[in-house]
Amino acid sequence: MAHVPARTSPGPGPQLLLLLLPLFLLLLRDVAGSHRAPAWSALPAAADGLQGDRDLQRHPGDAAATLGPSAQDMVAVHMHRLYEKYSRQGARPGGGNTVRSFRARLEVVDQKAVYFFNLTSMQDSEMILTATFHFYSEPPRWPRALEVLCKPRAKNASGRPLPLGPPTRQHLLFRSLSQNTATQGLLRGAMALAPPPRGLWQAKDISPIVKAARRDGELLLSAQLDSEERDPGVPRPSPYAPYILVYANDLAISEPNSVAVTLQRYDPFPAGDPEPRAAPNNSADPRVRRAAQATGPLQDNELPGLDERPPRAHAQHFHKHQLWPSPFRALKPRPGRKDRRKKGQEVFMAASQVLDFDEKTMQKARRKQWDEPRVCSRRYLKVDFADIGWNEWIISPKSFDAYYCAGACEFPMPKIVRPSNHATIQSIVRAVGIIPGIPEPCCVPDKMNSLGVLFLDENRNVVLKVYPNMSVDTCACR
């Protein structure tokens, strides 16, 4: 008896596979696009920016969960791009001279992810021009292709499925809080956002919100991004921390000594002893009175006089106030006659090397001084912020070319020094010599350039300020 093979059920026809293939390709494209890195041109993608999101999902009940450092670095990257832009173009940021960034702190309030911003570091002299809120917008959890296949749809009376509604919208809520309350505060604004097809960075203008909050003295803002797609009770914050940029015009930046007021964190010469804080001229110690008089010529452009104190008195005076340790070493036992004979030649050779080194240094300094023009001109000066102790909070630049003006303004003054009419008359009167004691005009900066500085404020927020009159362009006799 012949064996008849069992008949198997036919597989899916090739026509059905051809019909489903475009749909699956569309589904794969939407799913891949939902996990794409940020597409905003101003900020590069961060490879490990999801670490904070994973930590929050692992511990959803944490009331003070914060995002990882890579998510917060997006603020530093954006501010550095602004610094490079305005340093290269020489323009003013947003029509002003200050850009402040404020990082977000993530907290879970009532099972919702809320971002808090502390704007209290803004100065009273800073007039707000614009404020922008930068956030990473995620795609919807149900892409359109997947929503067609998997999401249940309502049906009409005849049993046919109803058409899909518009994509789910997100709501961005802003509230202001006072420092004396723990509630969510007053609702300052709300925005409806359409979810993008893929994750990208967006920026929204919140100038009225920030200005109103500052006017009312409520500089603690909260931002909350809600979506109807989110499951209740499961906070799903953005994998990248949002931040706020405030463009302002600092009216006090042109005041005298403004760069030291904003950038100097401490006194470079701290007084540990209360004695220097008293009026030196009223002190009974004559050495203190002479020290106070020695600082006068620095303020009246006169040459300082010689101090009659011996060097040892200088050292004892400064050592008393602990400005620096005493330069004098302890006396060693006097060596014997034989030891002095052995070391005599070595001491002579060492002294000769020091004298040769000093002579070479002096010759080099003299040649450099001879090469420089004696007339008033711009001289080179490079300032390194590490030398003055400001490198701990200044991000960029590390150093800059400040230049300075030096040289003579003698009669007759050439046109290259651009003398003013008053300087010309003063030089003539000095040359004639009728009125004694008239000094020659001074070599001072004529045109100066501004400098953008990127630094950290007291709250560790990145700030960009454009300081005027930081670098000498030309010099003149005045």
UniProtKB/Swiss-Prot annotation:
PANTHER family: GROWTH_DIFFERENTIATION FACTOR 10 (PTHR11848:SF145), TGF-BETA FAMILY (PTHR11848)
Biological role stated in the UniProt entry: Growth factor involved in osteogenesis and adipogenesis. Plays an inhibitory role in the process of osteoblast differentiation via SMAD2/3 pathway. Plays an inhibitory role in the process of adipogenesis.
Glycan-bearing residues: N118, N156, N281, N469
Gene Ontology, cellular component aspect: collagen-containing extracellular matrix; extracellular space
Stated family: Belongs to the TGF-beta family.
Tissues in which the UniProt entry reports expression: Expressed in femur, brain, lung, skeletal muscle, pancreas and testis.
Domain of life of the native organism: Eukaryota
Region feature (Disordered): 266-319
Residues excised as propeptide: 34-368
Signal peptide annotation: 1-33
GO biological processes: cerebellum development; fat cell differentiation; negative regulation of ossification; osteoblast differentiation; ovulation cycle; positive regulation of osteoblast differentiation; response to kainic acid; skeletal system development
Keyword entries, A-Z: Cleavage on pair of basic residues, Cytokine, Disulfide bond, Glycoprotein, Growth factor, Osteogenesis, Secreted, Signal
Pfam families: TGF_beta
Protein name listed in UniProt: Growth/differentiation factor 10
Disulfide feature: C376-C443, C405-C475, C409-C477
Record's subunit section: Homodimer or heterodimer. Can form a non-covalent complex of the mature region and the pro-region.
Localization per Swiss-Prot or TrEMBL: Secreted
Originating species: Homo sapiens (Human)
Organism lineage: Eukaryota, Metazoa, Chordata, Craniata, Vertebrata
GO terms, molecular function: cytokine activity; growth factor activity; protein serine/threonine kinase activator activity
